[in-house]
Amino acid sequence: MILVAGIVLGIIVLIAGLAVAPHAHADPDTDYANQLHGYGIYGLKDYNAWIGKNVCKRLYSGVDADAFKSAAFVSASLQRGTSTEQVWQFVDAAVNMYCPDERPVVQRAAERR
């Protein structure tokens, strides 16, 4: 009987612990950094996320009229030695992660490249 009571108490404690445990949530900046790493683009996660989010802000506000202007902004913001291909991968990943409604802008640029 004591053994059963101990098991029941253990289960109650376990359930209570699960109920108050913080829930895991996706971190888009980490996902973005991981995608960039796949392209060989490294750097501070927060800085790269800031650049990526600014790509979207610049497209939304009209500062960048097209993805070519966004790519120029990214190229100037990333480390020297970043290839043109990596710049475009960065822009594409930024749009996919932070402003997917701007996909047509990147698609038009891809058709012109």
What is the meaning of each model-derived region?
Residues 1-5:
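Bacterial Sec-dependent N-terminal signal peptides
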Residues 16-31:
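C-terminal region of N-terminal signal peptides and the immediate post-cleavage residues
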Residues 28-42:
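Short N-terminal segments immediately surrounding and downstream of signal-peptide cleavage
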Residues 49-63, 75-78:
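Amphipathic alpha-helical segments that form the core helices of the histone-fold
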